[in-house]
A protein has these predicted regions:
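Positively charged, polar, low-complexity stretches
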Residues: 2-98
Length: 98
């Protein structure tokens, strides 16, 4: 089970691959954090934003989780509009709906 709530059928290969990578990480927590964001935003990202998202997908899961939870500072190379959008997408006081 991928967890995704959208169909990849209408997506171009680049976006389909990114959707798969977002939902199939090494850590279930990152599957949820990246996958939910991809479900909500992947279809509308510009080509430049896709470059940024693919860079995020290439990062190590433990590092991503540390940055997103504030346990470690976000490196400049990842401090991009898409990363800030991803972090804002999950910035709330209640539990994450899975």
């Amino acid at each position: 089970m991928s967890g995704t709530e959208i169909s990849s059928a209408g997506l171009e290969p680049r976006r389909r691959r990114a959707l798969y990578q977002a939902w199939h990480r090494g850590m279930r927590e990152m599957d949820i954090l990246l996958g939910k964001f991809a479900d909500a935003h992947l279809a509308t990202l510009t080509d430049g934003e896709m470059d940024e998202f693919e860079n995020i997908l290439n990062a190590i899961d433990r590092d991503l989780l540390s940055w997103m939870t504030g346990e470690a500072p976000l490196p400049d190379e990842y401090n991009t509009p898409v990363m800030r959008k991803l972090m804002a997408f999950h910035d709330h006081d209640g539990p994450i709906n899975v």
